[in-house]
Amino acid sequence: RGVIEMIDIENAKRVFKEYVKNYNPNDGKIALKISHILRVTQKSRELAEELNLNEEDTNLAELIGLLHDIGRFEQVRIYNTFYDKDSINHGEYGVKILFEDGLIRKFIKDDSYDEIIKKAILNHNRPRIEEGLSKRELMHAKIIRDADKLDIYYVLTIEKLENSYGCKDMSKDEITDEIY
């Protein structure tokens, strides 16, 4: 093999931004998914940095974060739901779109990361990560699984509280010694 091309994460983000233009941003499900993906992308980078991974694996973790739910957009367009059991497995569908339909090459030219990306996306929404992965494949599968779950937790708890009760505004209140 020749020299491995570095992952251009900024280009991948531009491609993602173009890709999601194919879907209605005023659809609440689409808007929710875009914001979720962007948070997971950032969280994947943060987890990789916490693990002291090299730049290549940190960028790869971030790229996987960006791609992990790519199947969700067509899932919503076709089935109008995020429930895999009522439609399709979005991890498997994302891998189909990326690799069978060739979309992955718009995000990254080099194919040397394909197996890691594929296995991470396939496993991110499974109850258990499949056995037989290489150490590096397993690491990236765990990073995306954890980043995804952390954001789901955030959306279901913190964001819901902030939206429902205005907790974000309450946190700006001055703390005093006065007793109510």
What is the predicted function of each stretch?
Residues 7, 29-34, 38, 42, ...:
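Divalent metal-dependent phosphate-bond-processing catalytic cores, especially two-metal-ion Mg2+/Mn2+ enzymes
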Residues 13-39, 71-84:
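Active-site flanking loop/helix segments enriched in acidic
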Residues 52-63, 104-122, 136-143:
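Acidic/histidine metal-binding catalytic segments
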Residues 58-83, 91-94, 116-127:
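His-Asp-centered metal-binding catalytic motifs of divalent-metal-dependent phosphohydrolases/nucleases
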Residues 81-89, 105-109:
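Short coil/turn segments at secondary-structure boundaries
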